[in-house]
Structure formats: C-alpha cells, structure tokens
Regions:
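Ribosome-associated RNA-binding proteins
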Residues: 2-291
C-alpha cells in the first residue's frame, strides 16, 4: 500500500524558504529587478534585538554627550553645523521609533588567496523614517548576519536630510523633489524629476524603495548606465537624494544669521562632564580573568 502525503502550498513555500538559504539565492534571478518581493519586509527595529539593546548607551564622542544630555534637540541642529555623526545611537535617539530598514541585496564576493578562494558576503541595507531622512549602508563580512548588522550601523551613520517640495502650487504638504537632481556612481546616472501630486514614484524597484523611505510620494526618474549593478544603482539614487540640499532656491536667498556651534556654546559643559569611557572599556577587556 502506497502512502500519499498531502501538503499545503504554505508548507511547500516554507520548505523552499528553508532550503533556499541566503534570501533568494544571493540576489540571483533578476539582479535586484523586483523578483522576490518583500525580501526585507518587516525588518524594522522590532525585528532585531537582544543583549545589545538592553545596555544603556554610553556616548564616547562630544556630539553624543551633548545629545544624551539634551543640549541638542534635533537632527537638524547637527546638519546645520555639518557635524560628523560617529555613533549610530545618535540616530536611534532621535528617530528610533519611526526608523525602518530593508535589505536590498546580499551577494557573495570572492578574493583569491594562496590557500584558495575566500568567500565573503556583501549586504546592501536602506534605512529611513518615511519623513525626510534616509540612509544607505554597505558592509562585507564572513557571515550574512554580521554583514547585515554592520550595514545597518553604517546606514544609520550615513542618514541625510531630504528636501521636499511641490510640483505646482504650494498646496498641502510637500510631496516631491523641489527641482531636478542628478546622482552618479560608476557608470550609473540617476535623475529625479518633480511629478504632479498623485503620480506616485515612477522608477525601478531599487530607487523606489529609497524614495519611499525618504518620504517622497511623487517622482519621475530617469536612469542610464549599467543599472543591473544594484550597488551602483542604489548609491547613485542615494547621491541624488542627498543633493536636494546642495543648492539654493529663491526662498533661501535671504541672509542667514548663524549662531555658535554646539561645541562652542557648550564648551563648559563638555569640559565639566568629561570622562574617559573608551580607555576604561579597553582596560577592562584587557584584564585576564583569574580563578
């Protein structure tokens, strides 16, 4: 007597996912052109966590100390003075609840050594709050999880403000890019063009994810070059988005009154509360355990 096994389509999909391994075969089949939708869906702050999230943040830079002591109230104050952000916790402090991230692609890269080929994994991660802030991170590591984790940190450090505007009359909230902007990486050139309200984002899947995370609702795009190279395509789009604040429009021609940099304004506070946290951590890690 033969045995007949019945399985539902959901069980078959789960079995295929378990066999597939690294998120759709490392981007095979389509080169990031939209197949395997929802690969990174749900990868918000709630998707990852553990012991690292339970620890209290101890800032190690002057900017981090000013942020934690509530001397700096928003990210815009940091961008106004072009202060470099060296700690990803600063972005979590301001955008923690609204920040979402998505893995664009994971691909294997190889290096020829004397012992043979060394394979590592390269992760591309986009991050944004869907309201005027977006970042892109690229990380290569021996393990997929380590690469994704490192790419998320680098994406947070690269978060930039996004300038939004109107296509026609200034009615309602800004919904598109204020002017035509162009970004480039390698041979890929991406151009963002303002669009009427209700048009949506007319683009390939990769720029569409970045533009949605940036909070742009309507936009036309034009791309040329080898757009099949997902890394350069994403970097060119991110470059175009970051250039929205690189030019002046007539409404910004009026004279800007600059104030003191936070480092100058809170010099006494930084000098009074200074502690060498990084040195203490290094010494504690270097002390061997004796029984």
């Amino acid at each position: 007597m033969g045995l007949h096994l019945l399985c539902s389509p959901q069980m078959a999909d789960d079995a295929g996912a378990n066999r597939g391994g690294f998120r759709g075969g490392f981007g095979s089949g389509g080169r990031g052109r939209g197949r395997g939708r929802g690969r990174g869906r749900g990868r918000g702050r709630g998707a990852r966590g553990g012991k690292a999230d339970d620890k209290e943040w101890v800032p190690v830079t002057k900017l981090g100390r000013l942020v934690k002591d509530m001397k700096i109230k928003s990210l815009e104050e940091i961008y106004l003075f072009s202060l470099p952000i060296k700690e990803s916790e600063i972005i979590d402090f301001f955008l923690g609840t609204s920040l979402k991230d998505e893995v664009l692609k994971i691909m294997p890269v190889q290096k020829q050594t004397r012992a043979g080929q060394r394979t590592r994994f390269k992760a591309f991660v986009a991050i944004g709050d869907f309201n005027g802030h977006v970042g892109l991170g690229v990380k290569c590591s021996k393990e997929v999880a380590t690469a994704i984790r490192g790419a998320i940190i680098l994406a947070k450090l690269s978060v930039v403000p996004v300038r939004r505007g109107y296509w026609g009359n200034k009615i309602g909230k800004p919904h598109t890019v204020p002017c035509k902007v162009t970004g480039r990486c390698g041979s890929v050139l991406v151009r963002l063009i303002p669009a009427p309200r209700g048009t949506g984002i007319v683009s390939a899947p990769v720029p569409k994810k970045l533009l949605m995370m940036a909070g742009i609702d309507d936009c036309y795009t034009s791309a040329r070059g080898c757009t099949a190279t997902l890394g350069n395509f994403a970097k060119a789009t991110f470059d175009a988005i970051s250039r929205t604040y690189s030019y002046l429009t007539p409404d910004l021609w009026k004279e800007t009154v600059f104030t003191k940099s936070p480092y100058q304004e809170y010099t006494d506070h930084l000098a009074k509360n200074h502690t060498r946290v990084s040195v203490q951590r290094t010494q504690a890690a270097a002390v061997p355990a004796t029984s």
